[in-house]
Structures are given as C-alpha cells and as structure tokens.
Amino acid sequence: MSLAVRVIPCLDVDAGRVVKGVHFENLRDAGDPVELAAEYYRQGADELTFLDVTASSSHRQTMVDVVSRTAEQIFIPLTVGGGVRTPEDVDSLLRCGADKVGVNTAAINDPTLISRVAERFGNQVLVLSVDARREQGERHTQSGFEVTTMGGRKSTGIDAIWWVKRAQELGAGEILLNSMDADGTQQGFDLEMIKAVRKEVKIPIIASGGAGKASDFPPAIEAGADAVLAASIFHYGKVTIGEVKDAIKAAGYTVR
C-alpha cells in the first residue's frame, strides 16, 4: 500500500456540465465542473477525477476546455476518463492540464492501447478503469468477477481478475476498480472484490462504488485499496472529505 490513503471525488461531466445532482449552498453554479473542482480542492481532496460521460468526439473540445480551466485553479492531480481511444487523445488531455488519463472500453477492445500509452507517456499517467460485477447464476469466469461495459449493462465474458493482471503486465499504472453491484447502493464497497484484485496486482488500487457513509471507507483500505473514490455522497453533502479522512485516520491509516 502507498504511504498515505488518497480520497478522490469523481465528477461526471456531460457536454461541459456536471451530471448527478450536486448540492453545495455556497456555489453560484453547481453544474459547473470548475467550481465544483475548486470546492473539493478547498475541502482537502487529494486528487480529482472527471469522467466525460458524453465522450463523443464532438464534445472532446468541451472537455479539453473544462480540464484546462480546472488545472488553472486546483493544484492536485487531475485524472480524466471517458472516450479515450488513442494515444493522441491522451496527449491532448495531458497538454491541457490532466495529470492522469483513464481508459476503459477502448483498452478492452485493444489491449495494446495500454502498452502504447505507457511507453509514450509513462505508466504513471495511465489509470485502467474496470467496471466489474459478480456473475449471477452460471459462471463464465474463473474468479466469478466479470468485466462489463456500457455502465454495467453489457457483459464481456472477461474475468476481471485476469484483466487487471494483464493490464499490469501491459503497463497500467493504477486500477480504478468500480463495483457495478455496489455502485449507487450506498451500502459499502465490495470488499471481496478489492481483496481478490489486491492478491494479484502490485500497482495501486482505487476503490469505487458503494460508499454511503464515512465508516464505509476504512474497510476498503483494510481490504487492500490505496485510494478511495466516491461521487454522490460528496455531491449531496452527505459526507465531507474531511469526515472521510477523519474516519480513515481513526482506523489507523495515514492521510494527507
């Protein structure tokens, strides 16, 4: 595990606006990703993740503008994912101020994307986002955890544990592990999945999906996560970043 646990808010951006409701009374415009990023920076976020949910080429320039405006205001690492298909996409995001870039579906379709990006920019730049779920009924994977796409709607038949190992070999710098079963439930992270991935990879794991309260975060770290990511509980003001860090610290882990 890395020395200090990182707490990372995630913002879904659609055509330059934040989607999934965000409730901060002190913001003029809760739909502006740059304002929200600045608010989380003030709250003590260690990093920020933007997910471009439109991610079509027509909106790529909008996202580039959002990233460059954000990078002028916040001084913590910024990861941008969604619709990244080529090393050129990575290049344009890094040039406008992203520190790391997330890949998902494009890497499943062409795993060489991981090695091409890692060789050109360094593996510290590359975050592999994995949307995994437990297989129901008949199992097609050895581990029982399957990679999905389309926000969990489409099965790939790929074993999630095999995929993270392969991605590490190809040069991924981090794994953003999102449990599609836990996502949105606010019932806690999928600890078994985190443990299963931790056994197989040495690179950092960012746990995502399922956080509902501050006390949900320390068990994810205990299970092997190096960083924890959440969206709605931060956006709705249910829990602050400070409260999450306090809970992690109280459990005996180091925070920044």
Swiss-Prot record:
<comment type="similarity">
    <text>Belongs to the HisA/HisF family.</text>
</comment>
<dbReference type="InterPro" id="IPR006062">
    <property type="entry name" value="His_biosynth"/>
</dbReference>
<dbReference type="InterPro" id="IPR013785">
    <property type="entry name" value="Aldolase_TIM"/>
</dbReference>
<dbReference type="Pfam" id="PF00977">
    <property type="entry name" value="His_biosynth"/>
</dbReference>
<comment type="function">
    <text>IGPS catalyzes the conversion of PRFAR and glutamine to IGP, AICAR and glutamate. The HisF subunit catalyzes the cyclization activity that produces IGP and AICAR from PRFAR using the ammonia provided by the HisH subunit.</text>
</comment>
<keyword id="KW-0963">Cytoplasm</keyword>
<dbReference type="GO" id="GO:0005737">
    <property type="term" value="C:cytoplasm"/>
</dbReference>
<dbReference type="GO" id="GO:0016829">
    <property type="term" value="F:lyase activity"/>
</dbReference>
<keyword id="KW-0028">Amino-acid biosynthesis</keyword>
<comment type="pathway">
    <text>Amino-acid biosynthesis; L-histidine biosynthesis; L-histidine from 5-phospho-alpha-D-ribose 1-diphosphate: step 5/9.</text>
</comment>
<dbReference type="InterPro" id="IPR011060">
    <property type="entry name" value="RibuloseP-bd_barrel"/>
</dbReference>
<feature type="active site">
    <location>
        <position position="131"/>
    </location>
</feature>
<comment type="subunit">
    <text>Heterodimer of HisH and HisF.</text>
</comment>
<keyword id="KW-0456">Lyase</keyword>
<dbReference type="InterPro" id="IPR050064">
    <property type="entry name" value="IGPS_HisA/HisF"/>
</dbReference>
<dbReference type="GO" id="GO:0000105">
    <property type="term" value="P:L-histidine biosynthetic process"/>
</dbReference>
<feature type="active site">
    <location>
        <position position="12"/>
    </location>
</feature>
<protein>
    <recommendedName>
        <fullName>Imidazole glycerol phosphate synthase subunit HisF</fullName>
        <ecNumber>4.3.2.10</ecNumber>
    </recommendedName>
</protein>
<keyword id="KW-0368">Histidine biosynthesis</keyword>
<dbReference type="InterPro" id="IPR004651">
    <property type="entry name" value="HisF"/>
</dbReference>
<dbReference type="GO" id="GO:0000107">
    <property type="term" value="F:imidazoleglycerol-phosphate synthase activity"/>
</dbReference>
